[in-house]
Amino acid sequence: MTEESSDVPRELIESIKDVIGRKIKISVKKKVKLEVKGDKVENKVLVLTSCRAFLVTARIPTKLELTFSYLEIHGVVCSKSAQMIVETEKCSISMKMASPEDVSEVLAHIGTCLRKIFPGLSPVRIMKKVSMEPSERLASLQALWDSQTVAEQGPCGGFSQMYACVCDWLGFSYREEVQWDVDTIYLTQDTRELNLQDFSHLDHRDLIPIIAALEYNQWFTKLSSKDLKLSTDVCEQILRVVSRSNRLEELVLENAGLRTDFAQKLASALAHNPNSGLHTINLAGNPLEDRGVSSLSIQFAKLPKGLKHLNLSKTSLSPKGVNSLSQSLSANPLTASTLVHLDLSGNVLRGDDLSHMYNFLAQPNAIVHLDLSNTECSLDMVCGALLRGCLQYLAVLNLSRTVFSHRKGKEVPPSFKQFFSSSLALMHINLSGTKLSPEPLKALLLGLACNHNLKGVSLDLSNCELRSGGAQVLEGCIAEIHNITSLDISDNGLESDLSTLIVWLSKNRSIQHLALGKNFNNMKSKNLTPVLDNLVQMIQDEESPLQSLSLADSKLKTEVTIIINALGSNTSLTKVDISGNGMGDMGAKMLAKALQINTKLRTVIWDKNNITAQGFQDIAVAMEKNYTLRFMPIPMYDASQALKTNPEKTEDALQKIENYLLRNHETRKYLQEQAYRLQQGIVTSTTQQMIDRICVKVQDHLNSLRNCGGDAIQEDLKSAERLMRDAKNSKTLLPNLYHVGGASWAGASGLLSSPIQETLESMAGEVTRVVDEQLKALLESMVDAAENLCPNVMKKAHIRQDLIHASTEKISIPRTFVKNVLLEQSGIDILNKISEVKLTVASFLSDRIVDEILDALSHCHHKLADHFSRRGKTLPQQESLEIELAEEKPVKRSIITVEELTEIERLEDLDTCMMTPKSKRKSIHSRMLRPVSRAFEMEFDLDKALEEVPIHIEDPPFPSLRQEKRSSGFISELPSEEGKKLEHFTKLRPKRNKKQQPTQAAVCAANIVSQDGEQNGLMGRVDEGVDEFFTKKVTKMDSKKWSTRGSESHELNEGGDEKKKRDSRKSSGFLNLIKSRSKSERPPTILMTEEPSSPKGAVRSPPVDCPRKDTKAAEHNGNSERIEEIKTPDSFEESQGEEIGKVERSDSKSSPQAGRRYGVQVMGSGLLAEMKAKQEKRAACAQKKLGNDAVSQDSSSPALSGVERSDGGGAVPKLHPGLPENRFGLGTPEKNTKAEPKAEAGSRSRSSSSTPTSPKPLLQSPKPSLAARPVIPQKPRTASRPDDIPDSPSSPKVALLPPVLKKVPSDKERDGQSSPQPSPRTFSQEVSRRSWGQQAQEYQEQKQRSSSKDGHQGSKSNDSGEEAEKEFIFV
């Protein structure tokens, strides 16, 4: 009805606009008579707008009498032809109009507006009830509404229009931001979930119209709210929607502060909506209690569509409420086929009264996800029920923090194992926090092992208190389980069993994700390193399927670098989690080095590691060179701390890391040659060293057998020569195989010409042609469609051609686009994969061929050795190897230490059969590990240092020698368990010295001591051992028995007189070898003569009578230099081992400038003089009885040494060993020939001196002065040389004294020995003259016995004239 034909005058219309608002469009205006009390009527004007009706007075100025929204209408009754009664929520309005047509017009307008605002809904449904007499009138209206073309719905089903209408109905302000968010964000995401958190910033009242619109909206099917407290008004509106909407399917109100009354009202709302489509209900985190859930349960049984997803976790349920719920679920026949997700976690369900829940689970059902975590329900009872009802579909089973009711002495219920062995779909099993004894754990693992239906199972056994019993079960089962791809055994107290467990885990070929965190917290340092080494071997295994490793929250500190150093060359791990280990900036530095060469890692998690700005900068520098890492979450804990101390550097480094990660997501750059160079550097260098060693041995045999007759020998020689040529050519095997067929696939200047590139280029041209044709056809189709839709416009002349011509430029694609996509993106991906496969094949072929060469060379070596044995000749010494190694040494220095000589001998004595493909692979794996940085030596951990204190000062077995120090595995490593035992396997062997009769010299020396000392064997001369008590260290001793046994072979060939002379030296006093603080950076080096090695590996003895050279005393810096202590031989170690009880240690956490020092206690001069006088008397007595010859052979003469006072009040002893420059023992060839007999004598002397001797007392000074604090070394490993392992910390109060090796003194020397005041220089030279040969052996022992816990020691030495030379008597 237009305004011109309206019955309402224009003046009144203007007045009405002034009342209701001029912005509101008036659609219908009718004069009506409003019936009031009885038959009384009043003239009014009915004004209809798009969503509201107004009743105003019919006079000017008009006045608003009544208004109502169309949504308030509860019913319309038209019983009389011109009467219309409108019922609303507040009142009932009866109006009389001029004609029935006016009534129909009003109703038609209201229905049309409702249909336009709420498309998809019938106006009759919105108005609840429409009654018209006769009924044909309503039918005609319905036909009118249906015939009207419904305009296209707006975004999200026209939500914005509905929201505006609802705001008008409820009287709330219309928020344009709500309309924008829905029309833009929700439309873009194409989501059907209305999330109240998106509008949580608004007032709670503003949420009411948003929710109310869902009653009519047909787009949204899910209403969700999480962690948002909902007011009462909002809850009421939600209940209204539930009770009226048949479109809402999912209701998620998690942690919304709802109580029992809401659950009861929700049950009532469901009861009022028989057509409800609700099938997902999530009320987790709301204390609904048993009453509320019981009310809901009744309606769950009546839901027309059944329940698919039910989450009632943390709703304060008890077993009573769960049983009620289970009964209702069982009562609904649809539930068995519809319910797929059931979550009752977080409710206390302990006890046995859960029969209804077990019965429900035992019925055949379709549950896929079952969560009963943290309920304390019976694990075995649940599995028994699942066995009967949930085998077919159950995929996710979360039973963490439940209780296994198995008791000791009783068998595990068979149903427990049967469930895991019979399940058809299990993918994730979570039993974390459930205390599992070995029996149920074994049943679980065996059940999974024998289930061939399951694949890719994730098993979470974290915090199950498995401990040793569980570890043993895992060791016995895990290797054979084929269907576990993810295993979490963190926080299980497996510290003592991890070493063995990891070995068994490495045998499993299905585990791709492994979590071991929180199992190292209570682990001793001596047990930690073997575990990490085994873990490194596991991830380095070529066949290892492991892709993800987690060591989170293990508090490994710097020990985690053992794992990090293995990441650089690792090719299997794609994700590593080392967070919570406190590795510090040094760990970040090592991680940075690994990331620079790693091309496999995609995710690294490294928070909670005490990283500062410097560590972040190191990682940023490394990320610049890494193009493959994609995900490295910002370490929030460390970053927040670093930002407080150094914000600029930290922010800059973090920004760079994020930029490089973004670059890695966008770029396809792959350093193809980097992986090849890494493979070449590791494999080729390691393999070639092994081939070179065996080639040297074969070449020695070739040289010796070249002139021998015999066809067989000559044929073997020719075969060996051919093998040697192959071995030489194998050096270039990998490069030639990798580059075969031309250059690499991609160079620095881009792609090189190759068949693949040519094919891609031709393909690009073909694709471009096809694309152009498709685009032209598309343009033609568009223009045709436009002509069909707008034919009148398109009839104009030339418009079609103009449109096609104008669109041609816009629809074309640059010709280089397809080519760039194919060549620079897809092509690079293809070539990268080809390069990766090519390197894999080349490495495989090279490895197999080298294995064959090694095997052939080994057989050839054995054949040539057999020819020697048949000819009755001794095998020549492989001096060529030593000469070759010696020629390489002068690059660094021109002399070889005793330690290095022993190492050369050890390599010589390796049997050729040890050089096998297996040992080669071990060497390669060791080479792939980055050595531990020397920087760690500067750090000291007192707890770790104390763990290295030996209980017995005895020799560990020889085969374990240097297992930790050597990186290349020439000899297969022993099980790490043996390294934990501090007991020697020959401990109970009888001591040799107790079976021998003392010689005359020994008896003479023994007569001097007191009778008490003779009886108990524990007390010697009064002054013996005083200084050693305060100066000598007690350290862990490595085995040297192999050398003493070799020395014994010389004893068997010597005469009886020589035997007696050696025995006399065994009973004499010992010379305490004192060392000075040398200024040299390396320990003293001893030149050795070349002798044929003993079959038992005896150490070559140095010549006694070789030239002496004074060495410069050195001042050790606390940060860079090391002090080497001279140790006692094995014989004395064994005799003294049981007397030594404790070893004291001191903390070295102070600054390096205040270095700790070992020193000799400064004693009073009177006591020294008395001790010296007594010693001289004993020496004179011995000389008279034994004669000059015996005296010259006896080592009972006292030796004096000068001491240098240290800062701490102790004395630092000086030592001036001779340093001959010729490695064969003499400076000239003439001297070399003359020294040979003396060299033999020296060898025999050393052999005899290393035999066991009886223990001697160690007396303490009555009033000792304060000793300098001992130096405690700081870190287990060095980076310079694997052999330079310093001493372990020891007590200054216990000393082990070595027997003395001296040359025969001259008369002047003997006179000098009795002199009361020797000069300092003569004194030091005497020590040097008599002890340098002994020191060579002792120095090597010192090297082998040094603990892995030691680091550099440093101290200040006084070079000023304040140094005071003291006299001491050492016996």
Curated annotation (Swiss-Prot):
Keywords carried by this UniProt record: Acetylation, Cell membrane, Cell projection, Coiled coil, Cytoplasm, Cytoskeleton, Leucine-rich repeat, Membrane, Phosphoprotein, Repeat
InterPro entries for the chain: CARMIL_C (IPR031943), CARMIL_PH (IPR041245), Leu-rich_rpt (IPR001611), LRR_dom_sf (IPR032675), PH-like_dom_sf (IPR011993), PP1-Reg/Actin-Interact_Protein (IPR051279)
Residue positions, PTM Phosphoserine: 122, 968, 1067, 1094, 1280, 1288, 1291, 1315, 1324, 1331, 1360
Subcellular location: Cytoplasm; Cytoplasm, Cytoskeleton; Cell membrane; Cell projection, Lamellipodium
Comp. bias regions, Low complexity: 1244-1265
Region (Necessary for localization at the cell membrane), start-end ranges: 1055-1089
Ranges for region Inhibits capping activity of CAPZA2: 958-1082
Name of the protein in its database record: F-actin-uncapping protein LRRC16A
Species, as recorded: Homo sapiens (Human)
Gene it is expressed from: CARMIL1
